[in-house]
Amino acid sequence: MSPRFDFSAPAVAALAQADAARALQEDVADGDLTASLVAPGRRAHARVLAREAAVLCGAPWVEATVRQLDPQARIRWLCGEGERCAADQTVLEIEGTARALLTAERTALNFLQLLSGVATKTTAYADAVRGTRARIVDTRKTLPGLRLAQKYAVRTGGGVNHRIGLYDAVLIKENHIAAAGGVAAALRAVAPVAQRAAFVEVEVETLAQLREALEAGARMVLLDNMDLPTLREAVRINAQAGEDRKAVLEISGGVTLEGLRTLADTGVDRISVGALTKDVKAIDFSMRFQEG
């Protein structure tokens, strides 16, 4: 099993370096034709403005992008990672070679806009369940190649990461259950790999399946597309199972920001939201240059 990504500062910095290198290769390839009109040694100052209120996220990616083009660039953040910034606020000042800043501009802003969008949306969802036991959890519905960056943004916005990929945890879904011959049979079948997994979770669609999962020793159960009365009954059944049989309960399916609080008030532990990383509204940032 590949190790579960730990999101430590060094690991995030290395991830940002790799993502930035790949993005710059995609955008610049063998040279920025337009930036070549600027004299190689000319210096410039740039500032990045938020055009709307947001939770800022993506500083490691911005810095990696800029410094791969100008290792000596000076970067000063005026809004910290995970902090709320206001519309028209200057969030960042950069000083470096004009060519490097011009070439880095779009790639750096792409990272900042995307990751701030994820963090901002996650914060809105996390705020909506504040005061309940529920935590907001992400999914694997991410942009190809940017999963770890998006999951970092979810954490920055106050959410919790579910499994990183298929390699680090077990999620038994309806097709697995059908193939195995039932919930209990599916749980028995994954026992040989359970020790290698960060967790084992089983998806259920009915209260009968929930009871079967609890009796089989499931420690995490995903309640899929249940209506409110059924969810409340599921929480009651789980509570009555006793401390040694009780599972962590997670909701998935049809989750909206408007209905989130009602779901959280049922007493579930986790609410998974694919929209955090799948339906992202990028935050509007712009970069303005001043000749240095």
What residues fall within each predicted segment?
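Acidic/glycine-rich phosphate/pyrophosphate-binding loops and surrounding catalytic core
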Residues: 2-216, 220, 232-237, 250, ...
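Extended hydrophobic secondary-structure segments
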Residues: 222, 226-228
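Short secondary-structure boundary segments
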Residues: 225, 253, 274-275
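Conserved hydrophobic residues forming the short capping helix/wall of the S-adenosyl-L-methionine
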Residues: 238-242
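Active-site loop ensemble at the mouth of alpha/beta enzyme cores that anchors a bound cofactor
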Residues: 286-291
